[in-house]
Curated annotation (Swiss-Prot):
Belongs to the universal ribosomal protein uS13 family. Residues 99-122 are annotated as: Disordered. The keyword Metal-binding does not apply. The lineage of its organism: Bacteria, Pseudomonadati, Pseudomonadota, Alphaproteobacteria, Hyphomicrobiales. The keyword rRNA-binding applies. Keywords: Ribonucleoprotein, Ribosomal protein, RNA-binding, rRNA-binding, tRNA-binding. One of its GO terms (biological process) is translation. This is Small ribosomal subunit protein uS13. Located at the top of the head of the 30S subunit, it contacts several helices of the 16S rRNA. In the 70S ribosome it contacts the 23S rRNA (bridge B1a) and protein L5 of the 50S subunit (bridge B1b), connecting the 2 subunits; these bridges are implicated in subunit movement. Contacts the tRNAs in the A and P-sites. GO terms for molecular function: rRNA binding; structural constituent of ribosome; tRNA binding. It comes from Allorhizobium ampelinum (strain ATCC BAA-846 / DSM 112012 / S4).
Amino acid sequence: MARIAGVNIPTAKRVVIALTYIHGIGPKFAQEIMEKVGLSADRRVHQLTDAEVLAIRETIDRDYQVEGDLRRDTAMNIKRLMDLGCYRGLRHRRGLPVRGQRTHTNARTRKGPAKAIAGKKK
């Protein structure tokens, strides 16, 4: 099992698909990495030589921000917004949708489970 960017990628899958198991690499970046390294898209992970795995690993380390670094940057950007006190930061702080979605109905994913309200009795 190959280990790239701190993630064990599955050996039976095609390399393009296996690279998407790394946080920060989607199908587009995976294809781009394969082209930079010069590998066929049909290759499977277990068919790769150690040199090819090393080339993929070096390309990712050099050109892409993945896993912990990407998560840390995202968290720092959100924290910066909250410290500024801007509208987006306030929405993050209150746990509400940030990008203008309606909240009168829906937004349950962001707001959490519905709180019961005592209705009037008949």
